[in-house]
Amino acid sequence: MDGVHGWQGAYDAAGILAESVPPRALVDAAASAGCLITSDMPRALASAERLAPGKVARVSPLLREMHLEVPRWVRARWPLPVWAVCIHLHWLARERCGEIAAPSELQRAADAVALLDDASREAGTVVAVTHGAFRRLLALQLVAAGWRAERRVGGYQNWSSWPFSR
């Protein structure tokens, strides 16, 4: 499992590929937003810069990716893509059992909702650059706080968007 943990750490430390280009509609949304908020992880910072070059972004560790538990039921040495599938299947199984995240992660998502609430009151439209698993948790907390989820674009793919309104 040390290899898997090393891979997770390297992924967190990485930026984004030079050829990774956001869709025009997302670039336009980021450019016109009153506030751009991003996780403090390198790939989120790079994504924010790619979305809105030169725009000052607020940076918050509240929007960091949620670390998904490496399942202990996988005992063999497997290629990293197999581990990625097992990690996500384990997370989905825990979600189905009502355990989407640790209490500390749930609190962090609630704190992130408060951050986004405050930013939207100050600036109107907010674009938040965050990460897949945490975004799922954040989306649930936004809805619980009275926000309305609109049609998602791109699911969990890079450059996807999950709009919400109040």
Predicted regions and their residues:
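Short aromatic-enriched loop/helix-cap "lid" or pocket-rim segments at secondary-structure transitions
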Residues: 1-3, 69-74, 140-141
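Signature for phosphate-centric chemistry
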Residues: 62-78
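Generic beta-sheet signal
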Residues: 34, 122-132
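Short, acidic/turn-prone active-site loops that include or flank metal/cofactor-
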Residues: 61-66, 153-157
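Short, active-site-adjacent cap segments at secondary-structure transitions
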Residues: 44-45, 134-136
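Active-site-proximal alpha-helix that buttresses catalytic centers in soluble enzyme cores
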Residues: 1-62, 79-110
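Glycine-rich phosphate-binding loop signature in dinucleotide/nucleotide-binding domains
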Residues: 30-31, 116-124
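Domain-level recognition of soluble alpha/beta enzyme cores
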Residues: 146-166
